[in-house]
Amino acid sequence: MASAKTYVTKFKSFVILFFAPILLLPLIILVPDKFARCAYVIILMAIYWCTDVIPVAITSLLPVLLFPLLKVLDSKQVCVQYMTDTNMLFLGSLIVATAVERWELHKRIALRMLLFVGTKPSRLMLGFMFVTAFLSMWISNTATTAMMIPIVEAMLEQMVATNVAVDASQRTMELLDKNKASELPGSQVVFEDPSVQKQEDEETKNMYKAMNLCVCYAASIGGTATLTGTGPNVVLLGQMQELFPDSKDVMNFASWFAFALPNMLLMLVMAWLWLLCFYMRPNLKKTCICCGRKKKDTEKIASKVLYEEYRKLGPLSYAECNVLFCFGLLIILWFSRDPGFMPGWLSIAWIEGNTKHVTDATVAIFVAILLFIVPSQKPKFNFSRQTEEERKTPFYPPPLLNWKVTQEKVPWGIVLLLGGGFAMAKGCETSGLSEWMARQMEPLSSVRPAIITLILSCIVAMTTECTSNVATTTLFLPIFASMARSIGIHPLYVMIPCTLSASLAFMLPVATPPNAIVFAYGHLKVIDMVKTGLVMNILGIASVFLSVNTWGRAVFNLDKFPDWANLTHINT
């Protein structure tokens, strides 16, 4: 039996890779329509994405091959989808994030904020979560987790070592007292209950679990707050521009931030309370002097570890100052471009009729280019005071970024993945597959929109535990957009909750890279992640549902079916 299982596992990739296209052939043979040929490509990509038989980024290139061969789209129409405005926005933000990581500005920000928060365990965990979430808004979730977890580990190791030292000192004092007491007539020696030591070991394990989980959860939650913070948000923006080109910039950096930041903070606080209750319940019995001493020593050592890590960074360098300036400039330009409640700098010279010539992508690429120009060292203009060695060096110092670092650090695969999603959306629209799916979903018009949103959010949250969150949103959003247009509800009322639900990957180590990084440290079992992650999924879906049905309605005007959703751009 074992050998048969091994044999099947060995050839699983081969079978899926070559037999999946063959088994799907009846679809295009029995239904000789363009939308069926498009469905063939999408189903095949979904199978390859979920099974990972070839790299996800390479699967994303299948539309370039199959859409022209099956006469769904011509090659020029497909290829242009891989460098859309949305992809350039994401690429620009990735380059800026690379500069932040290269000069370790994110580490300085993290340690400074943690020192400010304090070292009481509950506050420390909240501090780690807020710092991780904040950094994850601007740089990748994976990079944030990879940077934060070593800090957590170093701090916990020192705290545990301090606890052991305090316990040893306490036991020595007790032993001396008992030796003195034993010399008295009628005295009895009382031995320490081993259950006390066992309980302390369990508390230490729970502390490790809580601190590790809080980082990976905060990374996933924090990325939802900005339009470029995580892949699903970028997919939503791209699908809106592709499926609803007349939506008039309803989805931009400022409008998304106004909606998503409160939701992110709500989810973060709920996650903190849940982890605190599940792993770090305050023990009311611990009110004795020795426990108070241990607690103070633990807090002191945590503060010492954080301060030591911060000291290693040295003073703020010239390069860090310049990166901070570019980063701040990017955020200011994004928010002030077209804030909505007032005219932005876009209205000065870059609007002609209904055409907005400058988008968030323009700003991102501008700052990205700036990073290859701004120097990483202070230029020396006084030639008379330069040493012989300094005169041999070029006058203009090296820039903050160079191409070698950029091509190594930027995750180019996700750019292809996003492009594949936009190509799929274009194929759905052009082939008529979107409209066909919309007609099949017309019976849902009798169901309350809130119930539809809740059910779809649960489906997406379960799916994203098994496959990439970008692939999940890429597959589902065109279907949900067609359904919303068919039954007459605002497309964003369905698309936003499902986009956010794709980031609720809390239950499995393979669900998202931050989970895998934390799991690799060995403090967690799969069952630990499943137990806490299941409740986290429920809390996340509840938070998203509340957000969309309260301030989300005001930000995106979700109560009214928009005119731009009625317009179709389909050539069937």
From Swiss-Prot:
Pfam family, one: Na_sulph_symp
Catalysed transformations (reactions): citrate(out) + 4 Na(+)(out) = citrate(in) + 4 Na(+)(in)
GO biological process: alpha-ketoglutarate transport; cellular response to lithium ion; citrate transport; fumarate transport; oxaloacetate transport; succinate transport; transmembrane transport; tricarboxylic acid transport
Tissue specificity of this protein: Expressed in liver, testis and brain.
Keyword Ion transport set for record: yes
GO cellular component: basolateral plasma membrane; plasma membrane
Keywords on record: Cell membrane, Glycoprotein, Ion transport, Membrane, Sodium, Sodium transport, Symport, Transmembrane, Transmembrane helix, Transport
Main location as per UniProt: membrane
Regulation: Inhibited by Li(+).
Annotated transmembrane regions: 13-33, 53-73, 80-100, 124-144, 218-238, 255-275, 315-335, 357-377, 410-430, 443-463, 491-511, 532-552
Residues glycosylated per entry: 382, 566
Protein topology in the membrane: Multi-pass membrane protein
Keyword Amino-acid biosynthesis applies: no
CDD domains reported in the protein's UniProt record: SLC13_permease
GO molecular function: citrate transmembrane transporter activity; organic acid:sodium symporter activity; sodium:dicarboxylate symporter activity; succinate transmembrane transporter activity; tricarboxylic acid transmembrane transporter activity
Function: High-affinity sodium/citrate cotransporter that mediates citrate entry into cells, which is a critical participant of biochemical pathways. May function in various metabolic processes in which citrate has a critical role such as energy production (Krebs cycle), fatty acid synthesis, cholesterol synthesis, glycolysis, and gluconeogenesis. Transports citrate into the cell in a Na(+)-dependent manner, recognizing the trivalent form of citrate (physiological pH) rather than the divalent form.
Family: Belongs to the SLC13A/DASS transporter (TC 2.A.47) family. NADC subfamily.
The protein's assembly and partners: Homodimer.
Protein name in UniProt: Na(+)/citrate cotransporter
